[in-house]
């Protein structure tokens, strides 16, 4: 939680309207049906997300201060790929609220972080609904195009910067560091395309669709929440410049995208086998 100034009141109101509007759309467009299995899975996802939120792994990378790697978003993505939209909305709100209660923070909650949680479940859920097995070729093309665009933009951004500020200290981004990051991004993209080709011949149509949805969901969340919304919320709450943390976030995404895809797909496939 953070204490808000009067200048942030309007942002809070706008965020509240957006969250309520998403809830109205979800419950109107996709009416909830009473389902014990969905409720049970939803409760498990909330518990898992809260537990992972309190755990973090510090990873040193290219001589920069350790990157804080957390996995609490992954159960929310899996929830989005597993549950109905209404249950996804409830899971995200419950996770955010209980996380704040357990953190025992004072002040009024910042609704931007609540919106993050909502999007982390609803984006995968809507992707699952609108990009199903009938759009398999389209889904594969979207995955490849999005990954190429993100990789090119990441390389362009890294190429243009020469210095980054992390935790109040300045670090030079030398040519060897830039080259190493380019290689990592290229390797990640190549491995992903190899995996897609490998699984395309090995998996059944439904499992292949699940694999593609896992890729697209993880990438979409990294792009919208991690790379765009979270820096904007930090700028709004604490005055941290939007681009100040982008370099570190690109490094973090190099780790989280492949790890997230593997975990999300594995968890989702296991759950699908159990509930079938």
What would you call each of these model-derived segments?
Residues 1-276:
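Loop-helix junctions at membrane interfaces
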């Amino acid at each position: 939680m953070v204490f808000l100034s009067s200048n942030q009141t309007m942002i809070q109101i706008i965020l509240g309207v957006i969250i309520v509007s998403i809830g109205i759309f979800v419950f109107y467009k996709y009416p909830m049906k009473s389902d014990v299995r969905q409720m049970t899975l939803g409760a498990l996802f909330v518990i898992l997300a809260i537990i992972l939120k309190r755990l973090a792994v510090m990873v040193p990378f290219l001589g920069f201060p350790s990157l804080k790697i957390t996995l609490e978003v992954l159960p929310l993505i899996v929830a989005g790929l597993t549950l109905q939209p209404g249950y996804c909305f409830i899971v995200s709100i419950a996770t955010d609220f209980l996380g704040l209660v357990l953190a025992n923070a004072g002040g009024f909650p910042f609704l931007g972080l609540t919106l993050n949680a909502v999007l982390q479940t609803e984006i995968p859920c809507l992707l699952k609904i609108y990009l199903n097995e009938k759009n398999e070729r389209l889904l594969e093309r979207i995955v490849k195009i999005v990954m190429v665009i993100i990789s090119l933009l990441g390389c362009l951004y890294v190429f243009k910067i020469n210095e980054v500020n992390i935790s109040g200290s300045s670090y030079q981004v030398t040519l060897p560091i830039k080259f190493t990051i380019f290689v990592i991004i290229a390797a990640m993209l190549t491995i992903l395309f190899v995996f897609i080709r490998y699984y395309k011949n090995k998996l059944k149509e439904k499992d292949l669709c699940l694999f593609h949805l896992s890729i697209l969901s993880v990438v979409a969340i990294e792009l919208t929440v991690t790379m765009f919304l979270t820096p904007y919320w930090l700028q709004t709450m604490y005055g941290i410049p939007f681009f100040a943390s982008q370099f570190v976030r690109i490094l973090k995404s190099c780790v989280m995208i492949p790890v997230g895809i593997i975990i999300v797909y594995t968890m989702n496939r296991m759950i699908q086998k159990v509930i079938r």
